[in-house]
């Protein structure tokens, strides 16, 4: 899944 962190994306 991709978590929206600010203006970027972090896969968790």
Swiss-Prot record:
GO terms for molecular function: toxin activity. The keyword Secreted applies. Its main location: secreted. Keywords: Neurotoxin, Secreted, Toxin. The keyword Nucleus does not apply. Expressed by the venom gland. One of its GO terms (cellular component) is extracellular region. It is found in: Secreted. Belongs to the neurotoxin 09 (Tx3-6) family. Neurotoxin. This is U7-ctenitoxin-Co1a. It comes from Ctenus ornatus (Brazilian spider). The lineage of its organism: Eukaryota, Metazoa, Ecdysozoa, Arthropoda, Chelicerata.
